């Protein structure tokens, strides 16, 4: 079951979910944009963009081991600012992270939550994808959310820190999950 904005607030208050810093305001106040939609919350782009070095002399072999071992020594990380955004050219893939840290704790006596990261429709209409095939944020996750940013449009897209880049949709998890660490968690 997808959580409403009211249930997202309740989960934050009860400790079944943590977002740091917490998106504010919780309700529309007429001054600031409210990051809580009826069934999602907006998250912002952090200040680092990472990408494979250009002109690498190899093909990616998915059987060679964990992605993080391949990506680390073959990538560049660029800090972006309001004065120096990252310009995402058409047909280019980069990795970004959310400004916010998200925690979906595994709970024994309460219903755990999982989430899906989705793009913002206004950005999608410009050709920007924020996840390619990896929308799932599993129960037990803690950290910033990695975004696979792809420009499928015909024009360059400037990426600024703190732009509302994606939205999280939360769902209840039936039963108590057993922790299963991955290359990105654990």
Name each region found by the language model.
Residues 1-186:
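DUTPase catalytic domain/fold
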């Amino acid at each position: 079951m997808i959580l409403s904005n009211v249930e997202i607030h309740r989960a934050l208050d009860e400790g079944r979910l943590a977002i740091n810093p917490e998106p504010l305001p919780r309700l529309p106040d007429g001054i600031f944009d409210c990051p809580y939609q009826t069934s999602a919350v907006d998250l912002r782009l952090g200040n680092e963009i990472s990408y494979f070095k250009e002109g690498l002399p190899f093909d990616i072999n998915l059987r060679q081991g964990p992605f993080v071992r391949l990506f680390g020594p073959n990538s560049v990380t660029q800090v972006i600012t309001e004065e120096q955004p990252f310009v995402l050219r058409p047909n280019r893939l980069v990795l970004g992270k959310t400004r916010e840290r998200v925690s979906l704790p595994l709970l024994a006596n309460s219903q755990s939550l999982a989430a899906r990261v989705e793009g913002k429709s206004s950005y999608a209409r410009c050709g920007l994808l924020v996840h390619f095939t990896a929308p799932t944020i599993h129960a037990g996750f803690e950290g910033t959310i990695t975004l696979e940013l792809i420009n499928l449009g015909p024009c360059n897209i400037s990426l600024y820190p703190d732009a509302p880049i994606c939205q999280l949709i939360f769902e209840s998890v039936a039963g108590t999950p057993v922790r299963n660490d991955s290359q990105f968690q654990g």
